[in-house]
């Protein structure tokens, strides 16, 4: 079989057949013809009949004559094979169904005022039927060529993905794409247009598919179920992605560092780590992001929008994923389990972070001082040490922070709210993560053991900090006096000595402190609370260090030796 040409997939129409179509259908013909011409050029197929294309671009008839003239003329070309953008069935609908539906039952006998008019109309109608029948047969004959064209062009487009060529470039930001449809979707980012609106809540979307997916939030329907673990999803694509958790398959590998991913989208996101590119900028505050989704989520900080509400406790969230994660607090569900040590997590990303403990891999390196980290977020936080930047400021007291999350935690000090309560002892906390850490006191689970001295820890962060005692590493240095510290938090606390700042004030007696933890300990004096009880003799203490010291009376332990 020879190479595919324009003539292989063309349909010929006579003038009589052309006149069967109304103005709208003729315009449709022109649009499809020009669109397919562009597709052929893109696929590298030569089109010889350029006079016809020029004629169509100028909005003229496919031949130079008036429509009412009935003399026989050379046939016109029609390429209603509509590759990709119009599948085969559309061809049949365009002529076979649309024309027949429009003229098949025109009732010409009823509308005629005279016998002559009736005969004339009847003759015209028969001619139309002949025209439609001819058109139908030509469409059926063309089907096999359509399939050949589809197969050829799909293969051609598929090959482009492997070559890495991106011929379609955005004029706004310069980003390139391998397909025209991808460029079209991307351009909406710059226009901000959201034509698809949800009738239920009024939320608008850039794509109709996003609106369709969003509607399921209101119905709560989850028709796609995982056969492995029984978890249900509202989208088939989400189920497909979920299944990879069970198989552990990672097909997509980074050529830069060799790291592998189970999704191509994750690989694309990862690549930005190496380039450092942040093309999505917030117009409100100027902050830039690597992904458009992160920018969308960030914008909600400025608007204060929290559309996702927990039915259990009423807490609202900016993202549906945050609500899903939050619900596990109430259910206690921990579906993500570490195969290495058996520890389970409520969030998949936490499991991913946890796994690094076992590998001790640190792929994220600071260019300033050479220090390496196992998470990109830790590297980002570390970089602030060199810049000294604190962009997140508390409106209540003016204190500034390097991270937005730290500011969020800090704000709770001013509100005094403690929504997270320990079921074991009744103690309440302002932050959920602190409650999680507190619970370890009751379980005494300490999975992290130091190989150097045998000491065990209940948190990986405490274990990491402890290791520095043996290495003697003190990377955080005070510019004022030169003193170095193991932890950045210790340096922050130390700096207050030079400034004399005491931002944490007791509402009960007015006494001020330079650390929030010291204020918390101080408050116990007023309440008389002694939550730390010795299991050996029953004596209670208001601080955990005091209990630790007391226990040595029973154990006779003397850890401090004179050198």
Swiss-Prot record:
Pfam families: KRAB (PF01352), zf-C2H2 (PF00096). InterPro entries: KRAB, KRAB_dom_sf, Znf_C2H2_sf, Znf_C2H2_type. Residues 4-75 form the KRAB domain. SUPFAM superfamilies: beta-beta-alpha zinc fingers (SSF57667), KRAB domain (Kruppel-associated box) (SSF109640). Keywords: DNA-binding, Metal-binding, Nucleus, Phosphoprotein, Repeat, Transcription, Transcription regulation, Zinc, Zinc-finger. One of its GO terms (molecular function) is DNA binding. A zinc finger (C2H2-type) spans 140-162, 168-190, 196-218, 224-246, 252-274, 280-302, 308-330, 336-358, 364-386, 392-414, 420-442, 448-470, 476-498, 504-526, 532-554. GO terms for biological process: regulation of DNA-templated transcription. It comes from the Eukaryota. Gene3D superfamilies: 6.10.140.140, Classic Zinc Finger (3.30.160.60). Transmembrane segments: none annotated. GO terms for cellular component: nucleus. It is found in: Nucleus. The modification Phosphoserine is found at residue 544. PANTHER family: ZINC FINGER PROTEIN, ZINC FINGER PROTEIN 493. Belongs to the krueppel C2H2-type zinc-finger protein family. May be involved in transcriptional regulation. This is Zinc finger protein 708. It comes from Homo sapiens (Human).
């Amino acid at each position: 079989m020879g190479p595919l040409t324009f003539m292989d997939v063309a349909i010929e129409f006579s003038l009589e057949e052309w006149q069967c179509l109304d103005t709208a259908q003729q315009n449709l013909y022109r649009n499809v013809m020009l669109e397919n011409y562009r597709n052929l050029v893109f696929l590298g197929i030569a089109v010889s009949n350029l006079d016809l294309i020029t004629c169509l671009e100028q909005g003229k008839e496919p031949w130079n004559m008036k429509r009412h003239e009935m003399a026989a003329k050379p046939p016109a070309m029609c390429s209603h094979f509509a590759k990709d953008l119009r599948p085969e069935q559309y061809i049949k609908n365009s002529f076979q169904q649309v024309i027949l539906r429009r003229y098949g039952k025109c009732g010409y006998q009823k509308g005629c005022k005279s016998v002559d008019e009736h005969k004339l109309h009847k003759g015209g109608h028969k001619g139309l039927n002949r025209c439609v029948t001819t058109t139908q047969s030509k469409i059926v004959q063309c089907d096999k060529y359509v399939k050949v064209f589809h197969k050829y062009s799909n293969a051609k487009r598929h090959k482009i993905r492997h070559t890495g060529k991106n011929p379609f470039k955005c004029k706004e930001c310069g980003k390139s794409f391998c397909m025209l449809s991808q460029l079209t979707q991307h351009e909406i980012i710059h226009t901000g247009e959201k034509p698809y609106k949800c009738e239920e809540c009024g939320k608008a979307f850039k794509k109709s598919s996003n609106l369709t997916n969003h509607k399921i939030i209101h119905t709560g329907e989850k028709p796609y179920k995982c056969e492995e673990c029984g978890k249900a999803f509202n989208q088939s694509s989400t189920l497909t992605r979920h299944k990879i958790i069970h198989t552990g398959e990672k097909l997509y590998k980074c050529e830069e560092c060799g790291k592998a991913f189970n999704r191509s989208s994750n690989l694309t996101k990862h690549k930005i780590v190496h380039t450092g590119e942040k093309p999505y900028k917030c117009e409100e505050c100027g902050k830039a992001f690597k992904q458009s989704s992160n920018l969308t989520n960030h914008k909600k900080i400025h608007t204060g929008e929290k559309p996702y509400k927990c039915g259990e406790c009423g807490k609202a969230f900016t993202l549906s994923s945050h609500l899903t994660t939050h619900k596990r607090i109430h259910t206690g569900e921990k579906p993500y389990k570490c195969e290495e040590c058996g520890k389970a997590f409520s969030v998949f990303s936490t499991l991913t972070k946890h796994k690094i403990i076992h590998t001790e891999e640190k792929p994220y390196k600071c260019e300033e001082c050479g220090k390496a980290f196992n998470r990109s977020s830790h590297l980002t936080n570390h970089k602030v040490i060199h810049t000294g930047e604190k962009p997140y400021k508390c409106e209540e007291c003016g204190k500034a922070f390097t991270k937005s999350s730290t500011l969020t935690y800090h704000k709770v000090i001013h509100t005094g709210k403690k929504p997270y309560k320990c079921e074991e002892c009744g103690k309440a906390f302002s932050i959920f993560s602190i409650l999680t850490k507190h619970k370890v006191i009751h379980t005494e689970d300490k999975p992290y053991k130091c190989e150097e001295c045998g000491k065990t820890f209940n948190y990986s962060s405490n274990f990491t900090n402890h290791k520095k005692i043996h290495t003697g590493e003190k990377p955080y240095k005070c510019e004022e006096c030169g003193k170095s510290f193991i932890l950045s938090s210790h340096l922050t606390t130390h700096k207050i000595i030079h400034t004399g700042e005491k931002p944490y004030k007791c509402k009960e007696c007015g006494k001020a402190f330079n650390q929030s933890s010291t204020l918390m300990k101080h408050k116990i004096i007023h309440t008389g609370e002694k939550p730390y009880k010795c299991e050996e003799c029953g004596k209670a203490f208001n601080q955990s260090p005091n209990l630790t010291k007391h226990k040595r009376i029973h154990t006779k332990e003397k850890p401090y030796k004179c050198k």
